[in-house]
Amino acid sequence: MQSVSDATRYYFLPLTPPMPDLPPTSASPTPWTRKHLLGLQDLSAGELTTILNEAERYKTKWNAGETKFDDLRGTAVANLFFEPSTRTKTSFSLAAKRLSADTIDFTASSSSLSKGETFIDTALNIQAMGIHQMVVRHSSSGAPEQLAREVDCCVINAGDGTHEHPTQGLLDIFTIRSHRPSLQGLTVALVGDIKHSRVARSNIWGLTKLGARVIVCGPPTLMPVGIEEFGVEVAHRLDDVLEQCDCINLLRVQFERQRGAYFPSVREYAHLYGMNGTRMKHAKPDVLILAPGPINRGVEITPDVADGQNSVILDQVTNGLFIRMACLSLLNGARSVQTQQEQSR
């Protein structure tokens, strides 16, 4: 069995770059048949659009006053979080409950992991209690994929190491789509710690497949080698690309994943890459300011920008609920179809 600590294949290199015919000029919805959601790298533009459209369906009903749905009634969802989380864990838990599923929230610190039980054995024991879907966050890149090979239930990646965070990427894209008629031709800047950011990876896969122009911006020390091969442009000075951007997604510096100093000081980083009122004056008047959170006020973003009229940060949190409802619903539908097919054989 592959060790989840073997994370080498989950960095930008040596992953296989997208095929030359990407990104597409348009994307029609594609019927959803996948049992797991492990990342955006392997999804087609049509599959991405299917998730976004399903999220839009829930959002429309929600805004019309419908806040409870029966789509997952009779099923059980387990949130297995082996890393701390506020927004993602709460959002998935609430999404499952809004769909009428039974939910359990697993906490690693109070589990049998402290007694030597393995990650896989823990998951298999939880599945044996009648779980239909598992939402997994883990510090090791590739852990959800390994789990998906061992369990019969659906697996959703809620963030694994520096690999991917697919639902965060989806909700970022959904938020942009909610404010713009199309992603095609939009210029989106991902600013900050690209090297350690699973959010950056999922955003790059999703945005480029849907036709956006993506600029990654940050210190050279926080930029993965060879990232240009993935259809993005690289900038090391935010001021050089600021006026071109339709959307700016400010990524948190991942101090907990860093070994050593990647820039002189936090103050220096904020001076070069932080979004502040002065920079807003040079940006497009309708630029969208995003941040996956948690935000560090005064580092990647100043309070006046975070709370300003261009900020859609809280919209991202709200939209995360609809994206996760969509993912849970679509995977459950695919699981039901596969179960029926197996029973009919």
Task: Name these PLM-found stretches.
Residues 72-77, 184-186, 286:
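Phosphate-coordination loops involved in phosphoryl transfer and adenosine-cofactor binding
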Residues 20-90, 94:
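Positively charged, low-complexity intrinsically disordered leader regions
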Residues 66-177, 297:
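Phosphate/diphosphate ligand-binding glycine-rich loop within oxidoreductases
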Residues 286-345:
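Adenosine-phosphate binding glycine-rich loop
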Residues 82-94, 178-251:
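Glycine-rich phosphate/diphosphate-binding loop of Rossmann-like nucleotide-binding domains
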